[in-house]
UniProtKB/Swiss-Prot annotation:
Residue ranges, annotated region (Disordered): 324-355
UniProt source species: Dictyostelium discoideum
Highest taxon listed in the record's lineage: Eukaryota
Highest classification ranks of the organism: Eukaryota, Amoebozoa, Evosea, Eumycetozoa, Dictyostelia
Name the record gives this protein: Protein HGH1 homolog
InterPro entries: ARM-like, ARM-type_fold, Hgh1, Protein_HGH1_C, Protein_HGH1_N
Pfam assignment, any one: DUF383
Length: 355
């Protein structure tokens, strides 16, 4: 272990065979915290960043993987973020001819686990504001007309990156900007067959529903977030005629595809309900839920669920939407109901969950 620092200068050796030997050895230990502690005082981060543009694909892969492993150490992750690496990672992720785009995306996902990494990606207040995130969304949705669009496992890491940036206020503001249409473009992916992608998209929706200042946009006909959220929890229950009155046509019995099923993933259903809870935080949100007549959907979901936590959360939403307007809860009551669903905001410690 003590000899590890001596290997770092060889990463910039002109001879590929020597460079690869050093990379292979450092790659083998970069997942070990003891090794990372020893390497902190070296130029390993700077040297590996220089190698991600190397002409040798094996060199690039090893360098990226080492950096990904180093991200497990908070100090080294913060150091990587400070190196202005985001533009290069975005280029590598969005280059459709790049066979290692997924590895670039993995590292970018790690970088955006920090608020500073997210701000670097967002370019808030700068000339390139939203440019990088829009490039990522363009790649994510570029195959939307293909038959396998809702089956493909490509670009899962891009979803995770967007999920990370919506953990902060600045990120939500850009993702929900009406002009760039990011939120609307990714919404259809709630129907994706891949559970990792569905979890990511629903996590993004949940984070965005947390921003009460954006509720008007979310519940507007332009977005119609309530219908989008109800589709994964609709199931194939046949609703009575009385239940269908006022319900969006997409949720009617006749509109459901044959064999339609409620999302089988507990985490997906949980995030749908958490999103609805956040939407009850504003009067317009509660009124919109009453107008949308989503009670039958929630009633059937409540009967479907077996876990107490999920049933309790569904019940919270139902309690709010069936009240008469003059009996609306006080802000204190809503805060009490929402306290378990509280997300980290820009002034809180920045954390994010894997999808």
């Amino acid at each position: 272990m003590d000899q590890l620092p001596e290997l770092v200068p060889f990463l910039l050796e002109p001879k590929s065979e020597i460079k690869l030997l050093a990379l292979q050895h450092l790659l083998g230990v970069s997942d070990n915290q003891e090794a990372r502690d020893i390497l902190k005082s070296t130029q390993i981060i700077n040297n590996c960043i220089k190698l991600i543009t190397d002409s040798n694909h094996v060199v690039v892969r090893h360098a990226l993987t080492i950096l990904i492993n180093l991200c497990q150490d908070t100090d080294m992750l913060n150091d990587i973020v400070k190196k202005n690496i985001v533009p290069r990672l975005v280029d590598g992720t969005t280059d459709t001819k790049n066979k290692m785009s997924e590895i670039f995306a993995m590292l970018l996902s790690n970088v955006t686990h920090t608020k500073e990494g997210c701000l670097s990606l967002m370019q808030c207040g700068k000339e390139l504001e939203a440019f990088f995130i829009m490039k990522l969304v363009q790649v994510l949705t570029m195959d939307s007309n293909q038959e396998d669009y809702f089956k493909s496992t490509k670009n899962n890491w891009i979803v995770n990156i967007i999920l990370n940036v919506t953990q902060i206020q600045e990120g939500r503001k850009i993702v929900l900007d009406k002009e760039n249409q990011i939120f609307k473009e990714i919404l259809p992916l709630v129907r994706h067959e891949n559970v990792i992608k569905r979890r990511g998209i629903l996590g993004i929706i949940r984070n965005c529903c947390y921003s009460e200042q954006h509720h008007d946009y979310l519940i507007s006909p332009e977005v119609d977030i309530l219908t989008k959220l109800c589709l994964p929890i609709r199931g194939n229950d046949k609703l009575d005629d009385d239940d269908l009155v006022g319900l969006h046509i997409d949720l009617h019995n006749s509109s459901l595809p044959i064999g339609n099923e409620r999302d089988q993933d507990r985490e997906c259903r949980k995030m749908v309900v958490e999103s609805l809870i956040f939407l009850t935080g504003t009067k317009k949100g509660r009124v919109s839920m009453r107008t949308a007549k989503i009670y039958p959907i929630l009633r059937n979901l409540f009967n479907f669920e077996t876990e107490e936590e999920l049933r309790d959360n569904v019940e919270k939403v139902v309690e709010l939407i069936i009240r008469d307007e003059e009996g609306d809860p006080t802000p204190e009551e809503i805060e009490q109901m929402n306290k378990k669903q509280k997300l980290e905001d820009e002034d809180a410690q920045f954390e994010t969950d894997e999808i």
